[in-house]
């Protein structure tokens, strides 16, 4: 318990426990956020391949919840001892397979969220299957999809999030390209169709959507 208290109040960084765990997909979100130590993130973050942010966030979540469960288990055992429970071994056995699904509401509020972030290529295209897997996983993981409607990281090519007839910096109108001839992939509708996640479609014009 002394170690747990130290980790929450100070930890290796002397700033206490992190408020969030951030898994970034290589791409536009990497460029917008710049590279360490010049990025603006005041919390631990990791950068992975274009398509892997949702999948890695699943592993990050499971590992983090295992660590949180160990802490909560120690607290529950201490509470049982303070309450004078005589069968300490039985109390310990009841927590043998204790996991995040058994956390109380108060315990869940103490768990920093895990957030996966990626742009059009990472979520609409090459990593679409990983995004779908996270939506179906039933884990309280947050995913932020940056809908720039082009492949921003590589200069602005047309991509699945663009609208019919789209022209862009790297796909200008000309003899060989008369505009995008595919309909837009509506990621919000596809996400809602999974039936397992809360979907919010926001806009930078109203930044309170993100708060």
For the regions a language model picked out, list residue spans one by one.
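Residues at structural and domain junctions
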Residues: 173, 177, 200-203
């Amino acid at each position: 318990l002394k170690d747990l208290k130290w980790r929450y109040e100070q930890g290796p960084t002397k700033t206490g426990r992190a408020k969030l765990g951030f898994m970034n997909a290589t791409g536009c979100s990497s460029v917008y956020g710049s590279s360490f130590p010049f990025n603006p993130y005041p919390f631990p973050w990791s950068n992975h391949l274009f398509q892997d942010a949702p999948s890695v966030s699943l592993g990050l979540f499971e590992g983090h919840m295992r660590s949180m469960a160990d802490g909560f288990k120690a607290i529950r055992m201490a509470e049982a001892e303070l309450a004078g429970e005589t069968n300490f071994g039985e109390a310990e056995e009841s927590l043998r397979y204790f996991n995040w699904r058994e956390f109380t509401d108060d315990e869940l509020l103490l768990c920093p969220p895990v957030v996966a972030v990626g742009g059009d290529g990472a979520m609409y295209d090459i990593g679409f299957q990983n995004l779908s897997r996270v939506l179906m996983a039933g884990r309280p993981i947050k995913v932020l999809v940056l809908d720039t409607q082009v492949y921003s990281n590589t200069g602005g090519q047309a991509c699945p999030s663009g609208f019919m007839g789209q022209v862009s910096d790297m796909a200008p109108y000309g003899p060989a390209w008369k505009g995008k001839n595919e309909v837009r992939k509506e990621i919000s509708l596809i996400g809602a169709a999974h039936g397992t996640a809360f979907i919010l479609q926001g806009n930078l014009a109203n930044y309170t959507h993100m708060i």
